[in-house]
Amino acid sequence: MNLRLNTLALALALSAQHAGAQTGQKPPTNPSVKMETFGTLTNSDPVEIYTITNSNGLRARVMTWGAGLVDMLVPDRDGAIADVTLGFDKLDGYLTRHPYFGTTTGRYANRIAKGAFTLDGKTYKLATNNGPNHLHGGLLGFDMRNWKGAAQANGVRFTYTSADGEEGYPGTLKVAVTYTLTDKNELRFDYEATTDRPTVVNLTNHAYWNLAGAGAGDILGHELTLHPIKFTAVDDTGIPTGKIEAVAGGAMDFTKAKMIGKDFAKVTGGYDHNYVIDTGKPGALVAAAEVRDPKSGRVMKVSTTEPGIQFYTGNFLDGSVIGKGGTAYKKNYGLCLETQHYPDSPNRPEFPSTTLRPGETFRSTTVYEFSAK
């Protein structure tokens, strides 16, 4: 997704900053959840960071700012540990211009055409922060909000209340995102939301993955399998045309494991496409994707209850963002597999609905499973 200008009106001062995890460090093996202060905002609100460790020594760090994933430490086939998510060592990077590294995006993840949608006969105007379109909830989406965190047995639950009219959306929306790190080496995301007025909801996590390690170069040598056999065709601004096309053996076809870079030059601007998942039974987890780094042997499998998955190859990373360890994140240094409803669904009644009404509960689950071989 495109970088966007940070529009925070207040300058944010930091304190008590916490250094990022170092590649190659052997993790502890006692399962735990520990909380620290990552920094402090100018209104004196703390930003908390939680370290979740499972019994196998797999470790994730998550923060209240943007209900975000900061680090994910995973061993390779030889047991060497690396952080496989792009991001920053310190909080200040997340408070300034960045491409949604690891954060929860909403109220509506992905694009809404021309920054407007009509619901129950009323048209709602939203910010156009991605060319002519609305992207990831607007100028101050869920990624730029400080959530409340609560440690659980093997994870953290984050909650946020989005006020009626925030970023132009109707209804007071109460949102929860729970991160769980299981002893099966799964990082699980569970989303819930309720509203007091009809609204639209589409939530995802915008982690950028590099299974060779954050900052280890581009991901074009990763091998990807995408199980869906169809994708939503888009115009030149990333908005669906309404046509759902078959991957049919072309550059979009990852139904069999394929190096991401193999057909990359055939896709104008790189991959940034929503694949259509055959979800089957409502609420059931369905295998959506698998990615492998041949050099390290690390493997990540993705399953979800969502009807779509956005495959994005970090096309707008240009070296201007300095991330973990002082690395300049260049084009294609990370890939995103964002589980979601389709882009522009509020304006496409033929797509799976993103409407949420009072008395209903939005629920969604996505699981990332890690291994090495």
Please tell me what each predicted stretch does.
Residues T23-L58, T64-K373:
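An exposed, glycine/acidic-rich loop-and-rim segment of catalytic or binding clefts
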Residues T7-Q17:
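Bacterial N-terminal signal peptides
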Residues M1-T7:
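Bacterial N-terminal signal peptides that target proteins for export
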Residues M1, L12-A13, Q25, G66:
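A subset of signal/propeptide-processing and intrinsically disordered low-complexity segments
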